[in-house]
Amino acid sequence: MREAVIVSTARTPIGKAYRGSFNNTHAQTLAGHAISEAVKRAKVDPNDVDDVILGAAAQQGTQQGNIARQSLLRAGLPTSVAGMSIDRQCASGMMAIATAAKQIIDDGMNITVGGGVESVSLVRNENFRMDNARDPWLENEMPELYMTMIETAETVADRYGRSRERQDEYALQSQMRTAHAQRNGFMDDEIVPLNSVSYTHLTLPTTGD
């Protein structure tokens, strides 16, 4: 059986939604930047890329119309390269990577790109209608289908007895680990600076806030 291997990785820094470093940067620009660098790091000819699969949970606004196809063109890949977008909500990027591997293992492709992109700052705005977003029958018969992540988190906390204090403690520990990793350059190799922003702008090194 054929095997799929990861030969390169690249990502952009992460910014806060609506007020962060990339709040006005299109998803195509972000994803295209990462794709371009990943292909370059892999030392492959862009013309040899068979497919680009990207996951995105909010495929509307600037992320509609096959964001994978738009992003690969933004990356400078030729029009002969196919693109496919996947929506599996929070697991969209993971599913895209798994699908990219499947394209090689089962479908005979040789080079694929898999990843995820999300720029909620440019998709959820005053024109994002939610009044008819839920199917009435599904909402009545299976209301859990439309649970938000915060509702899911509350359910998990109640079910498994996870206190708010313990979660806050773990969150702070995670933030401090991130700040430590940034200070020591542990993530430098995987981050591709974009417009001089090179680190994830989520933590303050001194406090972890």
Which residues does each PLM region occupy?
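Flexible glycine-/small-residue-enriched beta->alpha junction loops
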Residues: 101, 106-160
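N-terminal extracellular/periplasmic Venus flytrap/periplasmic-binding protein-like
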Residues: 11-13, 24-33, 166-202
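Active-site-proximal alpha-helical scaffold in enzymes
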Residues: 87-118, 157-186
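Conserved catalytic cysteine-centered active-site region
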Residues: 56-110, 144-151
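Short, well-ordered amphipathic alpha-helical segments that serve as non-catalytic structural scaffolds
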Residues: 27-42, 67-71, 96, 149-156, ...
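Phosphate/pyrophosphate-binding loops at sites that engage ATP/ADP/AMP, CoA/4′-phosphopantetheine
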Residues: 38-48, 160-161
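Single conserved hydrophobic/aromatic residue that forms the stacking wall/gate
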Residues: 201-209
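Condensing-enzyme catalytic core mediating Claisen C-C bond formation in acyl metabolism
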Residues: 1-27, 158
